[in-house]
Swiss-Prot record:
The chain crosses the membrane at residues 4-24, 42-62, 63-83, 103-123, 127-147, 162-182. Keywords: Cell inner membrane, Cell membrane, Ion transport, Manganese, Membrane, Transmembrane, Transmembrane helix, Transport. This is Putative manganese efflux pump MntP 1. It comes from the Bacteria. GO terms for molecular function: manganese ion transmembrane transporter activity. Belongs to the MntP (TC 9.B.29) family. It is a multi-pass membrane protein. GO terms for cellular component: plasma membrane.
Amino acid sequence: MIELLLLSLALSMDAFAVSLGLGARFGYNKRESLRPALSFGIFQGIMPLLGFFVGVTFIAFISAFDHYLAFGILALIGAKMIYEGLSQSEEERLDELSHRTLLILSIATSIDALAAGVSLHLIDVNVFLSCTIIAFTTFLLSYLGVLWGKRAGEQCKRGAEILGGVILIGIGSKILLEHLFF
């Protein structure tokens, strides 16, 4: 059970970091913070289940390029946020996160959970309970991340969008470097 809790925390860290950036950028209240937290939690819960059932064959195929995909997605969205933070006035900025962008972020931050699902065969745990714990942990940390990010964003106003973009690029770079060198 300890392995499962540690796995849940580890898998939720990327979503937590992205949530900090979203909170800083969009300044969500408690109710609005539920949307990204639910999305990240659901994807983090579904992906290991998918990995568990689809198994080693699919993981071997996707693991050859998943880190490039995650890096590319996060870097593009991060660069877009930085560009908008530097070039747009306060009135020109979008006040909400699009469903499409949230979906892409949810997929990008949960790709590692897909691979982790294969490893659930190696530890003696109930896969459905495991995925539920992973989903709940990610939901909770993402929710807190959005709220804490909002607080940080209130302190740095315009820089919040730039900070959010830098965080996304940083997470993408971390994913890429981990897969290339570790």
